[in-house]
């Protein structure tokens, strides 16, 4: 949050130090001048606030160059010169571009910061990322690509899907990720062409971050065709709950609540897409579907009467579990996946006929070596992959799972709405049946209404 010192407002900024005086603030970045009026302070402060995930990317000095600060300027404002040879990017916006925020102009071009030792500077953080990932369409070929947002696209199924779509040459993927630099490195490591992806920061455990992501995506001026809600967290061995920024148990707060808000906000964008393309896909899990063997492994998913969710899921005024019971990390994840499948069904019931958007969920197979299991015990991580490969025969590689999800994104044969897609070794994709717990329309409606209230949509 902004801090006041000597009558000035100093904002912790991801690119430099910005000092707000009583009258205004002026900066000089890359020989471009901009001034914010006092009336713009709340807007600019909001724009420049950076989430904890972005702060972790601070001070990437290995890219070379630094910012210098005029000590004389520090008494009233900050003058910064850029010696960089490359443009940087921040939160999905190219730094050299000018964006309008509530009447104030903000233009930033910088690569790294080395200001902490400068006198008078109270708070500094620097963020850098390759500019080429932020380019707006520069050719007819790029401009005509369809656009797909994938949450959690920096690893696992999300990254594999991004790769599969980019390889067609027909898709531009928006990688919505908590760790900006991890996503950038991941995209490069698998060879996704630089004109086929954009990384935009999104932490689903924070509603502020979700809303900022939507704003930043819209500033790219791309038409959204498909939203894939893929990201998930899983804490099977935790004895005590973790919580999101809004105070929800973290598995449900991230996997369900964050995605629910994101999907609702982006409905406006999806409705503008071409009818043959517009889809919303929410990744399910066999563990949340109790009519399967895996879904019957204790603890089983069970939302009960949603008593915990109705109370806020915060572990203080209510239980941290949706059903109001004692905390169980594995069950919290399974419950969140039931919520995902409920959300898909309710979107279909409420919006498909009116908008033509295809809403679906899927289970692409058991990705036994996914990073989702990184918090599991070592013995499980060692034995689970061979068990799935040689005993259940349900194992699927991340690459193959990514191709399957890419099918659900773009294959005309998988355009049926309200469907939970699954695969098996012999027959390929098929419409799977959901358990009674995961297909209760009254419970789905109640979940929707509670989620609307808790996310501030009503």
UniProtKB/Swiss-Prot annotation:
Q: Which InterPro entries match?
A: NAD(P)-bd_dom_sf (IPR036291), Prochl_reduct (IPR005979), SDR_fam (IPR002347)
In Pfam terms, one family for this protein is adh_short
Say which family it is in: Belongs to the short-chain dehydrogenases/reductases (SDR) family. POR subfamily.
State the GO CC annotations.
chloroplast
Where's it found, cell-wise? Plastid, Chloroplast
Q: Which residues form a coiled coil?
A: none
Q: Which reaction does it catalyse?
A: chlorophyllide a + NADP(+) = protochlorophyllide a + NADPH + H(+)
What protein name is recorded for this chain? Protochlorophyllide reductase, chloroplastic
Which pathway does the UniProt entry assign to this protein?
A: Porphyrin-containing compound metabolism; chlorophyll biosynthesis
Q: What does the UniProt keyword field contain? A: Chlorophyll biosynthesis, Chloroplast, NADP, Oxidoreductase, Photosynthesis, Plastid, Transit peptide
Its job: Phototransformation of protochlorophyllide (Pchlide) to chlorophyllide (Chlide).
Which EC numbers does the record give? 1.3.1.33
Its top-level enzyme class, in one word, is oxidoreductase
The protein's organism comes out as Marchantia paleacea (Liverwort)
Q: Which GO terms describe its biological process?
A: chlorophyll biosynthetic process; photosynthesis
Q: Does the keyword Chloroplast apply?
A: yes
**GO molecular-function terms, A-Z:** protochlorophyllide reductase activity
């Amino acid at each position: 949050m902004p801090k006041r010192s000597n009558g000035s407002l100093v904002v912790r900024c991801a690119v430099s130090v910005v000092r707000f005086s009583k009258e205004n603030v002026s900066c000089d970045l890359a020989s471009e001048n901009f001034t914010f009026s006092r009336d713009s302070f709340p807007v600019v402060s909001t724009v420049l606030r950076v989430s904890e995930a972005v702060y972790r990317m601070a001070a990437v000095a290995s890219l070379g160059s630094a910012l210098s600060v005029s000590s004389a300027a520090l008494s009233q404002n900050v003058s910064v010169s850029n010696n960089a040879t490359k443009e940087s990017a921040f939160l999905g916006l190219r730094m050299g571009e000018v964006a309008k925020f509530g009447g104030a102009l903000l233009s930033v071009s910088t690569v790294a910061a080395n200001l902490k030792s400068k006198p008078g500077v109270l708070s500094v953080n620097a963020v850098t990322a390759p500019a080429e990932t932020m380019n707006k369409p520069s050719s007819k070929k790029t401009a005509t690509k369809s656009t797909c947002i994938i949450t959690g696209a920096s690893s696992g199924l999300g990254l594999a899907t991004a790769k599969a779509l980019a390889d067609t040459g027909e898709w531009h993927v928006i990688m919505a990720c908590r760790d900006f630099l991890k996503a950038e490195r991941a995209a490069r490591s698998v060879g996704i062409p630089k004109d086929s992806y954009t990384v935009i920061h999104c932490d689903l455990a924070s509603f502020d971050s979700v809303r900022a992501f939507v704003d930043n995506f819209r500033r790219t001026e791309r038409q959204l065709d498909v939203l894939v809600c893929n990201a998930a967290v899983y804490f099977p061995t935790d004895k005590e709950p973790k919580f999101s920024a809004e105070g929800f148990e973290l598995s449900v707060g991230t996997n369900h609540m964050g995605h629910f808000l994101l999907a609702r906000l982006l409905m406006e964008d999806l409705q503008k897409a071409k009818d043959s393309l517009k889809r919303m896909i929410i990744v399910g899990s066999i563990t949340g579907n109790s009519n399967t063997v895996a879904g019957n492994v204790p603890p089983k998913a069970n939302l009960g009467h949603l008593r915990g969710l109705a109370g806020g899921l915060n572990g203080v005024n209510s239980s941290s579990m949706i059903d109001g019971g004692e905390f169980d990390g594995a069950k919290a994840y399974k419950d969140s996946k039931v919520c995902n499948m409920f959300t898909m069904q309710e979107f279909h019931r409420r919006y498909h006929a009116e908008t033509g958007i295809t809403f679906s969920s899927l289970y692409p197979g058991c990705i036994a070596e996914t990073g989702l299991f990184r918090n599991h015990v070592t013995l499980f991580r060692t034995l689970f992959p061979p068990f799935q490969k040689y005993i259940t025969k349900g194992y699927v590689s991340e690459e193959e799972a990514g191709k399957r999800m890419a099918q659900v994104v773009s294959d005309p044969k998988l355009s049926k709405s309200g469907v939970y897609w699954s695969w098996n070794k012999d027959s390929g994709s098929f419409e799977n049946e959901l358990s009674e717990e995961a297909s209760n329309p009254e419970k789905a409606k109640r979940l929707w209404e509670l989620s609307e209230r808790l996310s501030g949509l009503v």
